[in-house]
Amino acid sequence: MCHRCGLSDEDLNRRWSRPDQTLHPVIYNAKGLIEYCCRVLHRIPYFYCDLHGHSRRKNVFFYGCSQAGSWNAADRTVPEDPTEFLLLPHILQQTAPAFSLNHCNFRVERGRESTARVALWRQLGITRSYTLESSYCGCDQGPYQGYHLGTYQLHEMGRNLCEALRTLYEDGWKLKLVLACSSPQTFANEQPNRVVGGIAGLGGVRTYEEEAVLTNPSDDSDYEEEYHAMNECH
């Protein structure tokens, strides 16, 4: 059985849209706490991240949410600032050896509406809502190319993520300006399906010259990847 299933034999990361208090108590209460912050305290979380393992793609990467990459035509009519959700993966590309911006995907598919990242993005307005995937298949880039991800690399990735969040929170306005100026055509929505850019000009930050894919029909979707041989959900 897939270890993401609860006692009701359901994939718990497909129950975030309308969790049942009896069948999915962990999801129900976790979402309730976040919803309380948003609707009662009027404090929308700055960042949400679901941590997953990935059985097919390599490296560490994000799944995120973009209006421009949504299956819903109504979403695509809503203006958005892509730097709001793209800056964090750009920072990690510069600072985290195991992270791959090129593997990130910000497409919102219909079949993902009940996942944590999409439900919290859509229902509660959390712009930086992600799934962080760490591969079971190791890395094919950078200093860890050809090696599996061990506890050292996972701890390092955790530190890199926390440091990137601090950088984003403290210097996000500077990074937005640099990123927009380095690739203005991207943020003029001329090519809404692809994000090409760089974060350069800040001390200690390397130039980035790769691409983050918003929509790529050839990419495997995250539900197709979940342990689909040995760990298939029944």
Indicate residue ranges for each PLM-predicted region.
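Structured catalytic-domain cores with a bias toward divalent-metal coordination
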Residues: M1-H234
